[in-house]
Amino acid sequence: MSNTKIGIFDVTQKSNKQLTWVLAVLLVLEALVCVGDYIGLVGVSRGPLVYGISRITQSGVGKVLLPIVCSYFFIHTWFFFRRSLAAANSMLRYLVLAIIALIVCDMVLGLMPDSFSTLEQIQHPSKFTSFASSFKSVSLGLQTLLKTVLSIGLIVKFTGRIRTFAWVTLVCVLLIGDGRYLYTYLYNAGTGAFNQGLALGMMVFKYLTVVIPVIFLRRTMTYTNVKSADGDTDIN
């Protein structure tokens, strides 16, 4: 890697289009997941739209498959970013590879039969269910740590849109941690309409802290009509 800091990664025109539609689909799916969680939490009054969304998001299959499909699109975007880092000969690509590996593990656990939770499984979890729950908690912590280290590395080694993405990711990681504690405290302290409004605010907060980093990640890779890093077949 030269002394000149890279501010943006160049990808092929085909990859640029793929990244754009993947982002668009991901934004819609994440919105469905968040709205579904809100409906399930506060029991919003039924209507045609609410009923349709709840049918998709609150069924056993929907609760499992929607997050898995979202994870697939996250992996797709991270994969292109990792490949761009590899083309730039940056060791940070291994951090991205570790993040991808953890997401894949979460996906595999989500596809296991015990993931389709019933009331009986929730009240009397199997050994696998307990293991999966513990693993996902550990995975979340490791991903948070990896993203923090990755962000610091990107801030030091790169510039432009790549550095902006790193700062955005770092801020969102910190906000998510603090937001969970604040939400739990306020929810336990409040009642009735306050908690319903708090749940709505948390839904919006969760959606924004998930999708904003992905939007900025997408902006780090674009087609500039010159020889592309994405054209390199190296996938180390």
Regions found by a protein language model. Name each.
Residues 1-22, 83, 225-236:
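N-terminal juxtamembrane cytosolic/stromal segments of multi-pass membrane proteins
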Residues 15, 151-176:
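Membrane-helix boundary/juxtamembrane motif in polytopic membrane proteins
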Residues 24-27, 89-106, 166-178:
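Transmembrane alpha-helical segments of multi-pass membrane proteins
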Residues 26-44:
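Alpha-helical transmembrane segments of multi-pass membrane proteins
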Residues 31-32, 165-168, 173-236:
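C-terminal transmembrane-bundle signature of multipass membrane proteins
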Residues 43-58, 114-137, 182-205:
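Interfacial non-cytosolic loop connecting adjacent transmembrane helices
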Residues 65-101, 145-158, 217-221:
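Internal transmembrane alpha-helix with an interfacial aromatic "cap," most often the third helix
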Residues 104-162:
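Membrane-proximal helix-loop-helix units in multi-pass membrane proteins
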